[in-house]
Each structure stands twice: as C-alpha cells, then as structure tokens.
Swiss-Prot record:
It catalyses: hydrogencarbonate + L-glutamine + 2 ATP + H2O = carbamoyl phosphate + L-glutamate + 2 ADP + phosphate + 2 H(+). Residues 1-399 are annotated as: Carboxyphosphate synthetic domain. This is Carbamoyl phosphate synthase large chain. Composed of two chains; the small (or glutamine) chain promotes the hydrolysis of glutamine to ammonia, which is used by the large (or ammonia) chain to synthesize carbamoyl phosphate. Tetramer of heterodimers (alpha,beta)4.
Length: 1073
C-alpha cells in the first residue's frame, strides 16, 4: 500500500522535558520521525516544550512550536495549523496521554484530524490496565492474576484474594511512576494512595507477584497489511521486580532455549495483531521454566525501542513514521543496508549490554532500592563479541568512581545487598565472587540466572590470573579479547596505563573495529557504525579526506543532560557542511548523536583515553573536538593532549580552545590571577587544605560562605554554610580534603542577581548570543534556576559591564569556540563567578530564543572561519520574552527534599515564549508541570530574611482574587503591612495543619522558603507533602514574585500567544532589516 495522498500535513507531539523514565530517547525518535516524514514530502508541525532537543530546531519541521504540552494549547495549535493527521506514538507517554485527552475532548472530530498509526482504541487497550487484561485473556494469553482498583477500600479486599507480596501499577503513567512492590498491608495502602493520585484515570492495577521470574522483552513492528516482524529480543539481567529501565539488559537474549524463543516470538506477533498496533511496539514478558506471563505492552516508541534501534541498527522510529502515513514494510528501504526492505528481521553477531546511570550521587537521602518505579536518569550501551567483553566495556562507560574493585562490603552487608536490588548490585556480585561465594548461593539470593553470574565469575578468575601471572604477549591478547581495559590491567599488575599501552603496541596487539549492519554481515552496509574488539580482521576503511573526531557526552545524568548532545550534533552538522569527514565517539543509546546517519562514522565506545586513542590510531583524524561533550569530554582534554604529544607517530591535534587555557579557567588560583590582571572583580575567596585552614578563610571573608570541592560538574557537594559549626559538619561529611584536592571557599553574595552569558569567540571578535538574567538569586545552582532573555531588571550600565567583561575574558582565555560565563550583580556592581570555555547547558535555549545556532557557529569558527566571514558579530535583540524553567525529579525520588541550593538537582528543562514576562513565565510553569492557580488558596510560610520582598507579591495575589493563609510569623508580618489572612498551624504544633489541608485538596499553591537547618524539618515535610500530593510549590522568594506577576497578567484576561518559533525568528529578521 503506497503512501496516503490525503495526508499532507502531520502534527507530531514531542515528549517534553527530560525526566526520570523519559529521557533523550524521544528526541532521537522524534527527530528521526520528522526526517522520515519530510523525505515523503509530508509537512510536519511539531509541538514540544523542551528547547534542549534537536527536534525543536527550526529546520527539523515546517513549523516548530515550543509550547507547554497542554491539551488546551495543543487544541489552539490544531485550530491554527489544521493538520490532516496526528502521530501519537513518538512522544513517549506524554504524547499518548495528550492524544487520549484530545480525543476525549472531541478535538479531532471538531477539526477533522485523523489519528495515524496506532489507533486510540489500541492505546486504551494497553494503557487501561483492566481493558489490557481483558484483551489478553480474550486471545488466550496469560497475564498475572490481578484486579483494577479505584479506592483504598478495594485495595484492602485484594489482599484477601491474592495474598502478599503484590505489585502495584498505575494506569497511564510513565516509568512505573507511583507504582511499587508491597510486602505488607501498610505498604500496599501507601503505594496505592500514591498511585491513584498519579494515574490520569485514577486507576491502579494490583497484581500477583511474579518476583524473581526472568524478564524478557520483544520489540515488534506491524504495518497496515498485517505484516509483522520481530526486530530484537532483549533479556534483563535483573529479574522481575526491577523496572526494565532500571535493569542491566543484554541483547540478544542469552539464556532462552530455542523453544522458549519461538514461543515468545509467536505470542508477540499474536499480541500486536490482536491490539491492531501499527508501527513499533514493545512487549514485556515474565518467564519461568517454559511458562510465561505478559507484563505489559507499550504501543509506542519507548526507551527499549531506542535501545533496540541502536543494538540492531534498525531505525524503528523512522519506519514507524512511514507506516503511520500508510506505507508498508516491504515498500520501506532499510536505511542501513540501503538495499534490503524494512521487512527483513535484523540479525546480530555481537552482544550488547545496557546499564542505567542513577542520580544517587546527587540525592544522598533518596531511597536507593530498585523497584518497579524508575529512578535512573540515563543509560549507557556497550558492544562486544562476547558477554564478558560487552560487560567490561559497559562498566568502563558508566563514568563513575565505583569501578570494579574499589568499594568494599562486609559479609552481612553483601547478603543484604544481594537480596535487595540497589544501583550497586552488579558491583556487589563481583565482590561476593571475589570473596568466594558460590554461583548457586548468589543466584538464590538475587534470582539472577546462574548463566550471567558464571560469566562474571570468569572475569573475577581472570583478574586473579592477571595479578599472579606474567603478562606475556599471548596472555595480553587473551585478556584484551575478554574486554579488560589498559587502566584496569595497570591496577592489577602495578604498572602504569602508559606502560601497558606501549607494551601492547610493541607486540602489535591493536583494537580492530567491527560493523553494526543489521544483518550479521550478510549484506553490504552503507552506513558506517562501529565497535572495537580484539580480533584479526578490521572492517573500517580509512579515507584520505580531512577528518575530525568529536567526543560525545556519554550517559545523561544530573548536571550533564541532553543539551550537550544537542551541541555535539550541531558541531557535526556544521563540519559536514564544510565538507569535513566527521566521526563521533559516544556510548549513549538514547541520543541523536548516536543515530546511524548523524555522522560519517559512529564509534560506539566508552569515553576514556584508551578507547578514544584506539579510534585515533585507526582513523588518524586531523583533529579532535572536546568542547561540545560537557564535562566528560573536557576532563579528557589535558590528558589527551599529553598522550598525543607523547605519541610521536600521530599528527592529530586538539582543535578549538587549547586544553591548557581550559585548565586555566578550571584552576581557581590561575583564574583569579587572570581576573586581577584584567581588572575584573570576583567575590572574595580562598581555598583550604585542612579544617583549621577552612575556618580561618571563612572568618576572614565572613559568613555565609559558599564551599565546594575543586573541579566539579553540576555543583556536586556544594553548599552554603552559615556558621562555624555548619562548616565543621560539611568538612566531616561532604568532602575529603587534601593538599591535592583543596576545597574552595567564596563569599556568598546574598540577594545578588545571577547572570549567565553564552558567547562564541574566534580570538579576534566575540559574539554574545544572549545575556540571561536568573530568576532565583545567586546561590541556587545556575542549572536549577529559571532564567529570562532579555534581562528584565538589569540597568543599561550593568549590561554594558557584563558585555565588557565577557569580551575581556573570552580574549584573555584565548577562546576559540564557545564560552559560558556566570556573573552576579549586587548593588550595581558586577562580579565574575566562573568562566567555562566549552559548550554549556544553556546553548540550546539561547539558540532557540534568539534564532542563531551558537554551537554550529562555534564549530565553523574552529574549522577556520572568522565571525566576520560568517556574518555574526552583533548581539541579537529579540522582541519576545523567553524563559527557561527546570524540571525537578522529586516526585520520582521518595525521600529527597525538594529544595533548591548550590547543588544541581534538575533533570530537564522547558521554555515559555510570549511577548511579556507574565505570560512567558505562566507558560514555562505550566510546561514544567507546576501550574500556577488563577483561583483558590495560597499557603505562605516564609523565612524572616525574605519577608520584606513578599509584601508586594502577596498584594498582587490577593488583588487577583486568591485567598491567602499562612503560619503565624508570616501572617503577623503581612498584617503590619495591611494584608490580612488566616493562620494555619505549623506542622509540629499538631493538626489541622497545612499537610492535612493538602491531603483534603484544600490548597492550590504552596510558597515555602527554607530557613536554618533546625526548623528545616517542618519546611521539608511541607515541601515533600506538596510533591506527594501534586500541589504546585515554590521554594524561593524570587520565584514567588515572578509567579505573582504571571498570575496578575493572566487575570487581566490577556490570551496566550500561539506562534511557532519560526515566526518569532522571522519577526527578529524583519526588525533588523
């Protein structure tokens, strides 16, 4: 069936900000779908609230709307754009939920929009837990015994019926949010209450436990002709009871018998046919000794399908988009081989391993247990010829300190950790094996298949041999084939990494590269996508063209999000436009940078010195770019420069800003001297190598001070310290100080306004992309603060000072490419806090706000163009207001305190655009799932220092018709200023207090700013309850003032502007002409 001619224009809904359970995989699938539809001549209208994505680039679709993913707003876009159809399954859970909501509102009927691909019925039959169970039973498939409940009373009845433990799964939620495993009746009621609040239709499924069964997934594809294929099957190393997004996964499945595989394959095809899903779909099974249960079906592109795409090279989202407009699998060409149709099932001749990356280094109080609800922020994937090689490369890719053999646990601890899955479980298994625990005992405690544990045991045994035996050339070849990195061999043999590497080269033991080609080398592949191993034949052919290698950003984690992948992709595009052959090395399966056709060659490898050098030795690029991949690639800059210098046989150089100059910016002492030389003020500061020294420095500067370790990303272990006792606690708990690793102590500028600048420098001119004014005060990590372009309250003098300092610093650091500078303004004086000569997390937001692609311009500057040649020297002047707001993951992390400070906690971001601050801020809050109420009750409990600023905001809220109430201190203070409101008890004064009111849905907004450590407990309980009961909350006084402005603007009855980002950019061009 050829493409439908009646579908000329299609609406795609993106997945919004990155959050736990929904990361970059939807940007990767969304941008693939956009390109796929445009190839077929279809007009694309895209809506997404997340500016840090490639899919929201103005050239990705015909019209790009960066607007809140809210049904009412999307209805307005439909009214304006009049699309013929909508594709729901590309935007993850968000896309599905909004499509279902729009269908229920009757929007599609009203405007004649067809749902393409998977029909709404199929979405209902998979997302509504009760309907799903009925559908499966009707086709004779087995599901766990279960009951759907809508109240706590019904939940109690289920215990009598099914016994404990029980698994709770809310309907229409993401990453298992709100669900969990209940081992007692109390846990059941607590999780059910949370789940009912999360579910869009207030429904929770309680099912019998299949804990400990194996979890297997099948990725299946179907077209309108009813042709079905299985793309990939994957096996979770962790058993049932751990969400698949939290589990280590291997593909293809390793422990299934051929009989089991055929049984599940047939079931998968039967299920996708029964549900009438068109496009890609993911089916999860619980399997035990030939018996199985269907756990769930995702009728959409998912995290697992992104993994399956990268594992097989089969572009699932691209094919799904073509099926949605009526094409069939035999008409679609496999874009990797360019010769076989998409109806050929992929074949693998390698093993992939995926391991999640968790944010527990940021949330020390959060519960680290892994359950059926997701907590990880990202993941890595590694490819090897054997499972051992694949596992060892995966560990190396995680970019965490806890490599094998570093952490030690004692016997009782080991048993507990094996029994209860945590993020450290795989490392614990290795440790248990080292201590001589048997495979059988570990398998019994963990319910992990003995096959996987025996493979880990092989690694442990090989380590013992490496420690005791001489490293002969034959033995070295054997351990390299197994996947041991040089750095680990150096640790085990007491040599240096360089010695191992040199010995390897002398003996001619070099990495070879194999190709991922979807067909186990049966057909010729046209898109080069490689992984390294130690075999004899190498499948990559080097060319004589000018080549540049770009280092990617690795797994998504707090502090290093999708923004750096965005910068990487832009750099690749810019260099390819210049005719330069561009290669990428990265290990994140969720991103656009690891898509098969982003670069000329993709190397799926760990981002460490050895693996980067392997690629350089084989391909001999002219240069390497390290400034686009965030801290991961910046950390490699200096060591890589040294290594390239040491290797006289290589002519590769590091391009862009010199690593020595990058280091100058990171090294506080050197940077301080440069600032003095340039005559630029900094907050008073110092550094300490002992506790005594720290107290002396802090006393000299005067409390409060900002303390942090040197060299960090996303402000790890950063704190504002108010007195000596607090400082002593920080020194004991947070950091280990030594002469090599001093701690930095700075004067904390209270109530200062923080400013961020992104710029490009070619060593002659400096292009300022934008000056951003932060809404939260200095002291909240810049990655967690909302910010606005253009600045709203800074004077012309301050802005001129900011521009002057930016130029001086960029030229003083000899920057070639991007630079981000953070400053603070207090009393009209500007201080420089820090400068980072690399890509920053605000680059995508700035590029979308002002309409110029900064990362692309930077890459062209590095390739040799001047800013004058490129025609970019003037700072753009937007006529609209753009606000970046962040998305915080507290609702997915029970126990973590939702308060902002100098340590970064957000996972993603959204953008609000309109013609004034009020409307833009309202949109940004709506997009960040923190809807500002226009009617109802507001609860205020504010620390003393913030009370003067509250008066004006409280007046505006009252004038807008909202009812105010608060704790005694706040009520009395406002009464002195003529604002009267009700008093509510503090939490520790007993009931009825604000938490009781939240439980009864009697509060519409919480404004609570944290005080000193002592009475924080009350505040913590209020803020935590706000998250758990889904009440919008604000924890800084500046955000409260901004919210009051936004509510005031909205109450004046002004409509929100609905315009595409393309239209806003066009207006800027017209004004400039």
């Amino acid at each position: 069936m050829p493409k439908r001619e009646d579908i000329k224009k299609v609406l795609l809904i993106g997945s919004g900000p990155i959050t736990i359970g929904q990361a970059a995989e939807f940007d990767f699938s969304g941008s693939q779908a956009c390109r796929s539809l445009k190839e077929e001549g279809v007009q694309v209208v895209l809506v997404n609230s997340n500016p840090a994505t490639i899919m929201t680039d103005p050239e990705m679709a015909d019209s790009v709307y960066i607007e809140p993913l809210d049904a009412r707003i999307i209805e307005k876009i439909i009214e304006k754009e009049r699309p013929d159809g909508i594709i729901a399954g590309i935007g993850g859970q968000t896309g599905l939920n909004i499509t279902s909501e729009l269908a229920e509102m009757g929007v599609f009927e009203k405007y004649g929009v067809q749902i393409l691909g998977t029909p709404v019925e199929a979405i209902k039959n998979t997302e509504d837990r009760e309907l799903f169970k009925e559908t499966m039973l009707s086709i004779g498939e087995k599901v766990p015994l279960s009951r759907a409940v809508h109240s706590l009373k019904e939940a109690e009845e289920v215990v009598e019926e099914l016994g404990l433990p029980l698994i709770i799964r809310p309907a229409y939620t993401l990453g298992g949010a709100g669900g969990g495993i209940a081992r007692t009746k109390e846990e059941l009621l607590e999780i059910t209450e949370r789940g009912l609040r999360r579910s869009r239709i207030n429904q929770v499924l309680i099912e019998e436990s299949v804990l400990g069964w194996a979890e297997v997934e099948y990725e299946v594809m179907r077209d309108a002709n009813d042709t079905c294929i299985v793309i990939c099957n994957m096996e979770n190393i962790d058993p049932m009871g751990v969400h698949t997004g939290e589990s280590a996964v291997v593909a293809p499945s390793q422990t299934l018998s051929d009989e089991e595989h055929q049984m599940l394959r047939s079931a998968s095809i039967k299920i996708i046919r029964a549900l009438k899903i068109e496009g890609g779909c993911n089916i999860q099974y619980a399997l035990k000794e030939g018996d199985y249960r269907i756990v769930e079906v995702n009728p959409r592109v998912s995290r697992s399908s992104a993994l399956a795409s990268k594992a097989t090279g089969y572009p699932i989202a691209r094919v799904t988009a073509k099926i949605a407009i009526g094409m069939t699998l035999d008409e679609i060409v496999n874009s990797v081989t360019k010769s076989t149709p998409a109806s050929f099932e992929p074949a693998l001749d390698y093993v992939i391993t995926k391991i999640p990356r968790w944010p527990f280094d940021k949330f020390t109080t959060a519960d680290k247990t892994l359950t059926t609800a997701m907590k990880s922020t990202g993941e890595i994937m590694a490819i090897g010829r054997t499972i051992e090689e694949s596992l060892l490369k995966a560990f190396k890719s995680l970019d965490i300190d806890n490599q094998l053999g570093i952490k030690r646990w004692d016997e009782p601890e080991i048993k507990t950790l094996l029994k209860t899955p945590t993020s450290e479980r795989l490392f614990v298994i290795f440790h248990a094996l080292e201590r001589g625990m048997s495979i059988k005992e570990i398998a019994e405690l963990t319910s992990i298949n003995p096959f996987f544990i025996s493979k880990m045991k092989k690694i442990v045994e090989m380590e013992k041999c490496i420690r005791t035996e001489e490293l002969t050339p034959e033995f070295l070849r054997e351990v390299k084939r197994m996947g041991f990195p040089d750095s680990r061999l150096a640790e085990l043999t007491g040599k240096t990494r360089e010695q191992i590497s040199d010995f390897r080269h002398e003996e001619g033991i070099l990495a070879t590269f194999k190709m991922v080609d979807t067909c186990a080398a049966e057909f010729e592949a046209a898109t080069p996508y490689y992984y390294s191993t130690y075999e004899d034949t190498c499948e990559t052919n080097s060319t004589d063209k000018k080549k540049i290698l770009i280092l990617g950003a690795g797994p998504i984690r707090i502090g290093q999000g999708i923004e750096f992948d965005y910068c990487t992709v832009h750099a690749v595009t810019a260099l390819r436009e210049e005719g330069i052959e561009t290669h990428i090395i990265n290990n994140n399966p969720e991103t656009v940078s690891t898509d098969f056709d982003t670069s000329d060659k993709l190397f799926f490898e760990p981002l460490t010195m050895e693996y980067v050098m392997n690629v350089i030795e084989r391909e001999r690029p002219d240069g390497v770019l390290v400034q686009f991949g965030g801290q991961t690639s910046v950390n490699l800059a200096l060591p890589l420069k040294k290594e390239l210098k040491r290797r006289t046989d290589l002519n590769t150089v590091i391009l862009g800003t010199d690593p020595e100059d990058m280091d100058l910016a990171e090294d506080r002492e050197k940077f301080y001297l440069l600032m003095q030389e340039l005559g630029i003020p900094q907050p008073e500061g110092g550094y300490a190598t002992s506790q005594q020294e720290a107290i002396e420095v802090a006393k000299r500067i005067g409390f409060p001070v900002l303390v942090r370790p040197s060299y960090v990303l996303g402000g790890r272990a950063m704190e504002i310290v108010y007195d000596e006792i607090d400082l002593e606690r920080y020194m004991k708990e947070a950091v280990r100080v030594s002469p090599e690793h001093p701690i930095l102590i700075d004067d904390f500028l209270e109530a200062a306004c923080e400013i961020d600048v992104d710029a490009v420098c070619d060593q002659i001119d400096v292009l300022i992309g934008a000056i951003m004014e932060h809404i939260e005060e200095a002291g909240v990590h810049s990655g967690d603060s909302a910010c606005v372009i253009p600045p709203q309250s800074l004077s012309k003098e301050v802005l001129d000072q900011v521009r002057d300092y930016t130029r001086k610093i960029a030229l003083g650091l000899r920057v070639k490419g991007l630079i981000n500078i953070q400053m603070a303004e207090k009393g009209g004086k500007v201080f420089v806090l820090e400068a980072n000569p690399r890509s920053s997390r605000t680059i995508p937001f700035v590029s979308k706000a002002v309409g110029i692609p900064l990362a692309k311009i930077a890459a062209k500057v590095i390739a040799g163009h001047s800013l004058k040649d490129l025609g970019y020297t003037d700072e753009p002047k937007p006529k609209h207001v753009s606000i970046k707001e962040v998305l915080l993951p507290f609702d997915k992390l029970p126990g973590a305190d939702p308060v902002l400070g100098p340590e970064m906690k957000s996972t993603g971001e959204v953008m609000g655009v309109d013609y004034d601050f009020g409307r833009a801020y309202y949109k940004a809050e709506l997009a960040a799932d923190n809807l500002l109420p226009l009617t109802g009750k507001v609860f205020l409990s504010i620390r003393n220092a913030d009370k003067p600023e509250l008066v004006e905001a409280a007046r505006k809220l009252q004038a807008a018709g909202l009812e105010l109430m608060g704790t005694r201190g706040t009520v009395n203070y406002l009464a002195q200023h003529g604002i009267f409101m009700d008093t509510v008890k503090k939490v520790h004064d007993g009931s009825p207090n604000v938490i009781d009111m939240m439980r009864r849905d009697e509060v519409d907004l919480i404004i609570n700013t944290p005080t000193s450590k002592m009475s924080r407990k009350d505040g913590y309980r209020i803020r935590r309850a706000a998250v758990d009961f889904k009440v919008p909350y604000i924890t800084t006084i500046q955000a409260a003032v901004a919210a009051a402005d936004a509510i005031e603007t909205m109450k004046k009855g002004q409509d929100l502007t609905i315009k595409s980002i393309n239209e806003y950019h066009k207006e800027m061009e017209q004004k400039e002409e």
